[in-house]
Swiss-Prot record:
SUPFAM superfamilies: Protein kinase-like (PK-like). Pathway: Amino-acid biosynthesis; L-threonine biosynthesis; L-threonine from L-aspartate: step 4/5. Keywords: Amino-acid biosynthesis, ATP-binding, Kinase, Nucleotide-binding, Threonine biosynthesis, Transferase. The gene is thrB. The lineage of its organism: Bacteria, Pseudomonadati, Pseudomonadota, Alphaproteobacteria, Hyphomicrobiales. InterPro entries: Aminoglycoside_PTrfase (IPR002575), Homoserine_kinase_II (IPR005280), Kinase-like_dom_sf (IPR011009), Pseudomonas-type_ThrB (IPR050249). Its EC number is 2.7.1.39. This is Homoserine kinase.
Amino acid sequence: MAVYTDVAADDLADFLKSYEIGDLLSYKGIAEGVENTNFLLHTTRGSFILTLYEKRVASEDLPYFLALMAHLAARGVSCPQPEKTRDGEICGALSGRPAVIINFLEGVWPRRPNAVHCAGVGEALAKMHLAGLDFPQHRANPLSVSGWRPLFDLAAARADEIQPGLRDFIAAELDHLEGRWPRHLPTGVIHADLFPDNVFFIGDTLSGLIDFPFSCNDILAYDVAICLNAWCFEPDHAFNVTKARALLNAYQRGRALSEAEQTALPLLARGAAMRFLLTRLVDVLDVPEGALVKPKDPLEYFRKLRFQQNVASIRDYGVEAAGAVA
């Protein structure tokens, strides 16, 4: 979450007249995250989240995200639900941006995830993947392997400003990934952005998944790989096998990875690291002036990619390569 677009109090009050969520008491921007503009609203009827969708979210994709959240919630996945206007609409416009209000989900995201948190997210991810199997809508992933080189083209000329040699490193890795990316693994609905700040806990109990604007249809194990990178590294950049084992074991108790998925997981993790390296690289080189946003460090994912390049098999993540896991 972040704030790119400012919203005047009078404009917001007028916008809220279309909803039955009470009168506005206060609102504040949420600076965490990098993609959309978010505000925490306090009204006479409770707390809500207002999201203004920015550059990477097309307005025509919003029905997919919003319908998906309703679909998942109906199947027991805890996630926020959009508030409808008095006319039954779930998407409006504010400050020139598509805007949605969702209910406030209780809990906090873990600043220092532990193995219990990792097990919780593994279990929830498997549940989400299974719940999404009968979701009727389809959205291709614009940030999968076919979208990485266009992203690189946006940043290539200045990549070495971030780190000398980064341009050649990325170019070589893209060649490797594009030539080996798996085409026949199980697919379905994925979250595609399940970082710690998109998962809420109350104590050690997972209370909900949030922030679905990157959800799409893609390789299910790719979603697992994104989580390995997002949850299982320490602040000193060391990979924590205990966390990885907890995440993978919990996921496989809900949905076992096939032999082909297990074999492909290290490559998928390289691709997942590349995706976030590239989007962060583009973002850090193009922060709008005056934006209340904290760009994420692209070199964090450069280091994770370097680690994943040396992973030989799923055993390096702390689990056995075949059969049931403990």
